[in-house]
Amino acid sequence: MPNKRTIDLLVESFDLSVRRKYEIKNPNGDVVTTLYFPPITRADRKKAQARANTTDGLEISTQMLCQIAEKEDGSKHFAPADAINLQREIPEKILNEIELFMFDLSNDETLDEAKKD
C-alpha cells in the first residue's frame, strides 16, 4: 500500500463538521440565543478579510462572525450586512466574548493578540 500524501493525512485527521455551542445570555442570565461554530479554516479567514475590504482586525472578526455563526439546524445566524449593526448595537464586551469563543481563544487572550497569530 503506497504511503498517503501528507495533505490526505491532515484532512483525514480533522473533522470540520464538529461544531461548538455558545449561548448568549442577557444580564439576567437568560439565554437569548445559541450560536454554533464550525472550525475556522484559512479560507474562512481570507473570505472574511475580502468581505471586510480592510486589514482592520475588528472589521474582519465581525465579518467572520456573520459568515460562520450557525443556528442549530446549520443555517446562518447572520447576513454579511448584519456586521455593521452588530458593531453599532451590541456592547463591545459581548461582541468580544462571542468572537473570542468563535476563534477558540480563552478570555485571557485579547483579540489583538489573536490577530497577531
Residue ranges and their predicted role:
Residues 7-10, 20-22, 48-54:
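Short secondary-structure capping micro-motifs at structural edges
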Residues 1-15:
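Low-complexity intrinsically disordered segments
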Residues 12-21, 63-64:
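A short, compositionally biased
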Residues 18-30:
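Short acidic-hydrophobic surface loop/beta-edge motif
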Residues 28-117:
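Short, surface-exposed, charged amphipathic helix/loop patches that serve as local interaction elements
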